[in-house]
Amino acid sequence: AYRAGLAIRETLARRDSANTQWQRDLSVSHNKIGDVLLVQGDGPAALDAYRAGLAIAETLARRDPANTQWQRDLSVSHNRIGDVLRAQGDGPTALVAYRAGLAIAETLARRDPANTDWQRDLTVSHNKIGDVLLAQGDGPAALATYRAGLAIRETLARCDPANTEWQRDLFVSHTKIGNVLRAQGDGPAALAAYRAGLAIAETLAPRDPANTEWQRDLSVSHGKIG
């Protein structure tokens, strides 16, 4: 179905290259196909699809730098490519992609600090970069990046304590930071981070006993604290 849609959108995009909506639709189609290919385990083909979408997103973003939707599309495209590269073990190239996405996310977040979606996007970029840096053995840089994301997530969580997604984001940040600190041999600081995460997990888990993700988070927290 996605390929049939892609064929139609390619025809439309060729027919009128100045029609930005059709161009964006085509980029979305490439990304959806990439998502399917990735789930099927075909990383190289997914990467090709994502790069086709990225090329269109770059063209649109250059055409109108003030169009925040197109800028966000471009940031997401970079992150998708980074995800595939990282899964393939190509950390350095993944880092380049993630940093390209981060640069856009930072610009958007500065443009409208009240836009919580853009603020959250920025935290996601920080965490992706931190994950790669940690895998490369650069604990201090990973920690700094994770903490940059944590600061934003703390602000979001305070703004809306009822937003469970933001609360869980905060749990994830505390846990990532705890992992780095533990690896660095800083047990007391790691324990403080883990306990901050546990407090959130203990709040979320009773709220919805059927939510297996939250139940697992609680189990993981207890395991890390020991």
Outline where the language-model segments fall.
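Thr-biased low-complexity repeat/linker tracts and other Thr-enriched repetitive architectures
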Residues: 1-226
